[in-house]
């Protein structure tokens, strides 16, 4: 499994996703080697399958590091395929990547390409350079070539598959495999974190868990707090240098340990999932985790979010969450129905076990 953009340890969704996928496959008896930016000194592998192997590449931590770790990844994959027998290469793609599918095609090994978001849209939100014509054209060519070299692949939403098929129509044949959540960790019975006592909170709690990146509607979180002064808005996460303003009811508690996240969720009254009015094609981990803790969810109404939630969350247009939240919180019957519906849906349809089943099926079809 080739995932050079992934750092271990880290709290970003891509790390949580890839570790859960690799570990789940190892638990099913597959011999899995995960190539990533692995820090053996700081990584906690206590809860991972002991048979899951890691292949570490450099983690430069400098501008344009992607060029460096992608090139090293390609060399390492070639070396691995030349010295050991692998049945399939599973490559987590990104802009200017494809080290796994490229090496596999050169060594005569079958490969699949994993696409988790619209790389071009993510790139445009992260850097203005992506708007420049030469850069933009080279980026699109990278997307097209990765799809072309792969023997198969999957996206995490139907919307995303439609989007990337514009880069290369071959992607129309990709499978759709939604993300899952850890149903042994995110449970309604989790012991509360005690955040009410720690922060001396009165009234309802609205919670957001995740990185404060451009793909999340961070400004909308601020607006929710401003327009609802009696509501406690808790933001757990960090990254990307986004400093939230100081408001008396807005609490940015930073990153939590993984085990602390469900403890926070079960103490909250509603889970927030705001997004800008741009559909990246995500399969939102946070929403499934909210649901697993029986937390009612209010999210931005985007095609990919509709597909992910299937009517089990309250969806509102981008920018309108601040006015919708108090209406939902005041309707206890609706809150109860949302929490029960969300939990039933997530626990039966959105666990990692379901994701692993579909991934193994794709491997079998590709090999």
Model-derived features with residue positions:
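Short His-centered aromatic/hydrophobic patch
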Residues: 91-96, 115
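Nucleotide-sugar-dependent
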Residues: 216, 257-264, 269-291, 299-311
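Conserved donor-binding/catalytic core segment of Leloir-type glycosyltransferases
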Residues: 200-216, 221-226, 234, 339
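Membrane-proximal helix-turn-helix segments that form the acceptor-binding/catalytic region
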Residues: 75-79, 98, 102-106, 119-120, ...
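N-terminal subdomain of nucleotide-sugar transferases
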Residues: 1-46, 223-226, 302
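Conserved acidic donor-binding segment of nucleotide-sugar-dependent glycosyltransferases
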Residues: 311-320, 327-333
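Carbohydrate-associated surface elements
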Residues: 159, 180
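A charged, aromatic-enriched C-terminal amphipathic alpha-helix characteristic of glycosyltransferases
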Residues: 333-364
């Amino acid at each position: 499994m080739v995932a050079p953009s992934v750092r271990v340890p880290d709290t970003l969704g891509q790390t949580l996703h890839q570790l859960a996928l690799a570990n789940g496959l190892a638990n099913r008896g597959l011999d899995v080697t995960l190539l990533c930016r692995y820090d053996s000194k700081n990584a906690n592998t206590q809860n991972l399958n002991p048979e899951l192997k890691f292949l570490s590449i450099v983690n430069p931590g400098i501008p344009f590091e992607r060029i460096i770790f992608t090139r090293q990844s390609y060399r390492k994959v070639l070396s691995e395929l030349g010295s050991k027998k692998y049945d399939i290469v599973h490559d987590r793609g990104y802009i200017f990547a494809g080290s796994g599918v490229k090496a596999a095609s050169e060594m005569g090994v079958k490969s699949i390409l994993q696409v988790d978001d619209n790389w071009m849209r993510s790139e445009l939100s992260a850097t203005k350079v992506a708007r420049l014509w030469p850069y933009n054209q080279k980026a699109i060519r990278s997307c097209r070539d990765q799809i072309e070299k792969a023997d198969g692949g999957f996206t995490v939403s139907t919307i995303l598959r439609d989007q990337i098929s514009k880069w290369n129509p071959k992607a129309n044949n990709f499978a759709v495999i939604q993300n899952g959540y850890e149903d042994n960790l995110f449970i309604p019975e989790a012991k509360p974190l005690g955040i009410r006592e720690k922060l001396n909170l009165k009234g309802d709690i609205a919670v957001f868990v995740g990185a404060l990146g451009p793909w999340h509607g961070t400004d909308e979180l601020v607006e929710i707090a401003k327009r609802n002064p009696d509501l406690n808005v808790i933001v757990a996460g960090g990254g990307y240098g986004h400093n939230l303003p100081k408001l008396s009811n807005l609490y940015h508690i930073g990153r939590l340990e993984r085990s602390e996240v469900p403890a926070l969720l079960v103490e909250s009254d509603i889970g927030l999932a705001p997004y800008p009015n741009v559909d990246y094609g995500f399969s939102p981990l946070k929403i499934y985790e909210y649901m697993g803790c029986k937390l009612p969810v209010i999210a931005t109404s985007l095609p990919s979010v509709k597909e992910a939630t299937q009517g089990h969350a309250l969806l509102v247009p981008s920018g309108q969450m601040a006015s919708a939240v108090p209406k939902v919180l005041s309707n206890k019957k609706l809150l109860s129905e949302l929490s029960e519906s969300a939990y039933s849906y997530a626990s039966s349809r959105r666990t990692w076990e379901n994701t692993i089943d579909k991934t193994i099926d794709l491997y079998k079809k590709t090999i």
